[in-house]
């Protein structure tokens, strides 16, 4: 439901996340268009994270660790295959993200089905769940600060020349590289 709402509210989301784009109609329209293409990826990545967690709990780490490679392969292939058919490489990459998310979801769902059948259950509020919830919110705040820094950086960069948001993104990727390599 939220994805549907955000899909149609994308112009307002772009105004909040990249207010500097409002001064450049072409950049704003492209951001809205790409946002509408990519936003459904959030459904896939949420399910991917859920299924990767189920795998990890059961001691199966390979599928969750390999899932980002599926997205990277999808992005590379989309550049080569889709760019000639579409108007820009940005369009190809936007669709590549969506396709990659779908393949990540399928891959992890199949990995989970090998040993577990997902089902919806009503949680019992026992000691373990209370402890989890007590530890969850400080962890959420801690990880949220990093994401908030990225959002603030994006807002500021939207007022700078074209390419500044990409530089912020690349800097974040470099910042995460040691964690990705050494875990």
Question: What are the residue ranges of the model-derived segments?
Answer:
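Membrane-embedded alpha-helical bundles of multi-pass transporters/translocases
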Residues: 1-183
């Amino acid at each position: 439901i939220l994805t549907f709402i955000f899909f149609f509210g994308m112009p307002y989301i772009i105004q909040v996340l990249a207010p500097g784009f409002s001064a450049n109609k072409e950049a704003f329209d492209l951001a809205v268009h790409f946002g509408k293409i990519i936003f459904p990826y959030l459904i896939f990545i949420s399910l991917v994270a859920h299924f990767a967690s189920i795998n990890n709990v059961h001691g199966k780490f390979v599928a969750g660790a390999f899932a980002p490679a599926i997205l990277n392969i999808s992005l590379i292939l989309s550049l080569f295959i889709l760019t000639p058919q579409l108007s820009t490489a940005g369009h190809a990459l936007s669709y590549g993200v969506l396709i990659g998310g779908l393949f990540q979801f399928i891959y992890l769902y199949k990995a989970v089905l090998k040993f577990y059948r997902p089902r919806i259950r009503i949680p019992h509020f026992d000691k373990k769940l209370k402890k989890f919830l007590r530890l969850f919110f400080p962890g959420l705040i801690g990880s949220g600060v990093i994401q908030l820094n990225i959002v603030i950086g994006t807002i500021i960069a939207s007022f700078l020349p074209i390419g500044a948001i990409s530089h912020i993104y690349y800097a974040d990727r470099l910042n995460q590289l040691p964690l990705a390599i050494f875990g």
